[in-house]
């Protein structure tokens, strides 16, 4: 695999494609000396989950802090916040109020607030809750060791919510695998500025990690036994990773399609996913990757938000319902049975019954498998927060219930249709409900539970689906020599 030219991947990828560098083999590092305990409470998206894991890595490497699930025994207590939903700030201050007691009796506990609410509120958090020691944004989590030391040395609260572009990734420890599936962040921020969204203001505009840096991280994880890579970004399919800028050469850029093709060549990687996407950036290059790369999961999460062109325009999404459906048709031409999930906002300011019916028509036409659906939540500082909203809350809730019921019914029919089929499942570990069984996910993100030998954990197995449950599937392994 080392030295394999990316230009060999396909004719489509051959134009100005980089050659793969020899990728390092990850070697286990000596465990840090444990000098204290760390507790992290995480709210929000998968990007926050990834960031929290990196906080733990940074503080384990530099401060010797070991994770605990009990804040009362922790030396450092952090909350990684999300500002997408309504009343996010109040929920954070409520959490902080409960933690204030941790400092009783002069215990030198460090309390920190990170994430998107931290970016929005900054110094205001310390003014309202002066017992908070650290406030840091998503782009400055790598500076946690310096912030903690500065707090202890100066006795003053530390606030750093700057946007130092890609510096964060340059200063993180080598990745540590914690199971057969891993998240890899390939970009930060968003430059779309949808009228309802705070992400560009809390995480900054789009910045992509260099192409080769991503490949190195994936190779390190693969060497540690990771078999499934989940590529992360607020607008992940806008990825433009620089390469080939040595010796004064002008940089070239790899898009998500080329990144996926290249990751698929890394030994050990058997499945690739990515989230979250924007329809505007769903390119023909990505469709071609679905056509050509069998490791790319037969699943796509593509948030559409609404089916009314009038509402999509007010949201500043940049596409029409017809344009969205056109992209889905292109994708299904190369992956006819792909599962597609989406996001919907119900009750956006000015949404009429006719607008909502157009959303339901889009749902029917596309046949979404799953959705993350919410009633519109006004976010201060966004353009949509100034729009008049005169739709009664009861009407919004009724629309949401109808939308979710429709998608849930369709998802149930898909699950039922999988009975009798053989699904490729990555074995993640013992089932939560029955430790004598194994569990993993199908390509279309359904949990699958089945009897099996624990030594199969971390491997792909073929499972015959025998029963569809409300939120999962049951099955049995199609036996071969390795599964005996």
From Swiss-Prot:
Alphabetically ordered keywords of this record: 4Fe-4S, Cytoplasm, Iron, Iron-sulfur, Metal-binding, S-adenosyl-L-methionine, Transferase, tRNA processing
GO cellular component: cytosol
The keyword Transferase appears for this protein: yes
Domain spans labelled MTTase N-terminal: 36-153
Catalytic activity as recorded in UniProt: N(6)-dimethylallyladenosine(37) in tRNA + (sulfur carrier)-SH + AH2 + 2 S-adenosyl-L-methionine = 2-methylsulfanyl-N(6)-dimethylallyladenosine(37) in tRNA + (sulfur carrier)-H + 5'-deoxyadenosine + L-methionine + A + S-adenosyl-L-homocysteine + 2 H(+)
Molecular function terms, GO-annotated: 4 iron, 4 sulfur cluster binding; metal ion binding; N6-isopentenyladenosine methylthiotransferase activity
Region (Disordered): 428-450
Positions contributing to [4Fe-4S] cluster 1 binding: 45, 82, 116
SMART domains assigned to the protein according to its UniProt record, in alphabetical order: Elp3 (SM00729)
Binding-site positions, [4Fe-4S] cluster 2: 190, 194, 197
Function: Catalyzes the methylthiolation of N6-(dimethylallyl)adenosine (i(6)A), leading to the formation of 2-methylthio-N6-(dimethylallyl)adenosine (ms(2)i(6)A) at position 37 in tRNAs that read codons beginning with uridine.
Family label: Belongs to the methylthiotransferase family. MiaB subfamily.
UniProt protein name: tRNA-2-methylthio-N(6)-dimethylallyladenosine synthase
Protein source organism: Xanthomonas euvesicatoria pv. vesicatoria (strain 85-10) (Xanthomonas campestris pv. vesicatoria)
Gene it is expressed from: miaB
């Amino acid at each position: 695999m080392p030295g394999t030219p990316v230009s060999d991947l396909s004719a489509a990828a051959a134009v100005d494609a980089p050659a793969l560098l020899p990728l390092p083999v990850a070697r286990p590092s000596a465990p840090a000396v444990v000098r204290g305990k760390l507790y992290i409470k995480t709210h929000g998206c998968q990007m926050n989950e990834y960031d929290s894991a990196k906080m733990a890595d940074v503080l384990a490497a530099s401060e010797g802090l070991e994770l605990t699930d009990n804040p009362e025994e922790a030396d450092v207590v952090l909350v990684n916040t999300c500002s997408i939903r309504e009343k996010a700030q109040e929920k954070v201050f409520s959490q902080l109020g409960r933690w204030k007691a941790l400092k009783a009796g002069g215990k030198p506990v460090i309390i920190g607030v990170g994430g998107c609410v931290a970016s929005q509120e900054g110094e205001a958090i310390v003014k309202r809750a002066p017992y908070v020691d650290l406030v840091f944004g998503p782009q400055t989590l790598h500076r946690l060791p310096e912030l903690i030391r500065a707090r202890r040395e100066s006795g003053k609260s530390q606030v750093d919510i700057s946007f130092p572009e890609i510096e964060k990734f340059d200063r993180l420890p080598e990745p540590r695998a914690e199971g057969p599936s891993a998240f890899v962040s390939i970009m930060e921020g968003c430059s779309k500025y949808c009228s309802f969204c705070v992400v560009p203001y809390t995480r900054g505009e789009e910045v992509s990690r260099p192409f080769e840096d991503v490949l190195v991280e994936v190779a390190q994880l693969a060497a540690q036994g990771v078999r499934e890579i989940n590529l992360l970004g607020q607008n992940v399919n806008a990825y433009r990773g620089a390469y080939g800028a040595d010796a004064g050469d002008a940089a070239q850029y790899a898009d998500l399609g080329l990144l996926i093709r290249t990751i698929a060549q890394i030994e050990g990687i058997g499945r690739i996913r990515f989230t979250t996407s924007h329809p505007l950036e769903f390119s023909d290059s990505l469709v071609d990757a679905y056509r050509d790369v069998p490791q790319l999961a037969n699943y796509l999460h593509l948030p559409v938000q609404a089916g009314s062109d009038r509402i999509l325009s007010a949201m500043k999404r940049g596409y029409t319902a017809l344009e969205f459906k056109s992209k889905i048709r292109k994708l299904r031409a190369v992956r006819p049975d792909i599962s597609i999930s989406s996001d919907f906002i119900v009750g956006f300011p000015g949404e009429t019954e006719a607008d909502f019916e157009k959303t339901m028509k889009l749902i029917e036409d596309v046949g979404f498998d799953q959705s993350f659906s919410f009633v519109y939540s006004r976010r201060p500082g966004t353009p949509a927060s100034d729009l008049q909203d005169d739709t009664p809350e009861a009407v919004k809730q009724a629309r949401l219930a109808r939308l979710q019921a429709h998608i849930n019914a369709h998802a149930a029919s898909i699950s039922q249709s999988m009975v009798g089929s053989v699904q490729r499942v990555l074995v993640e570990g013992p089932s939560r409900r029955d430790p004598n069984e194994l569990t993993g996910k199908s390509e279309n993100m359904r949990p699958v539970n089945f009897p099996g030998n624990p030594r199969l954990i971390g491997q792909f197995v073929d499972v015959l689906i025998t029963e569809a449950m409300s939120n999962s599937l049951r099955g049995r392994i199609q036996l071969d020599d390795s599964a005996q």
